[in-house]
Amino acid sequence: DVGTDQGMLAVWLLQNKITDRVTACDINAKPLAAAMRTAQKYGVEDRICLRLSDGLSAIPESEAQDIVICGMGGELIAKILSECPYVKEKSRRLILQPMTQIPFLRRYLCSTGFDILRECATVDRRHVYTILHCAYTGRCREIDDWFAYTGKMPQEKSAAARQWLLQESQRL
């Protein structure tokens, strides 16, 4: 969990038995302290490894099978991925939730050999977010503007996806 903030995602993953261990990192010490308090509150502190890290720089490859990067801009997510060679191992899965610059991130991913396997939208309160599930295939490709702006969202049939597409069309 890159950019863990208060550690809620890490705790949720453990509580819901999605995984039995989580490495959560943040670039600042204060969010890591908050994440430790959250882990202690929910009794999972023995299964969370917290690391002070700029992106994935302090995360050993052995601790990063699935990589989750949420709540950052698309350019920062691309930078984090570009600085970490092991994200290009085909066994790794990426879950990315960009807050801004989504077309930039899609272009980066596709042009550097990542495949966007699926996209979905989710609504939290009044905000609609897009989530990308990606993996490295080594197949680099250029994408057109339509795909850069909409990705695989038009294929999704959920109400959240329709809401996301409407929101994006109004923004353009």
Predicted regions and their residues:
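Conserved beta-strand/loop positions that form the S-adenosyl-L-methionine
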Residues: V2
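Conserved Rossmann-like nucleotide-cofactor binding loop
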Residues: K30
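Class I S-adenosyl-L-methionine
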Residues: S57, E63, E75-R171
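Short helix-capping segments at alpha-helix termini
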Residues: K17-I18, Q40-D46, Y86-E89
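Short SAM/SAH-binding signature in class I
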Residues: A64-G71
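Conserved SAM-binding loop of SAM-dependent methyltransferases across substrates and taxa
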Residues: Q6-T19
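Conserved SAM-binding motif I beta-strand of class I
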Residues: R21-D26
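S-adenosyl-L-methionine
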Residues: A33-S62
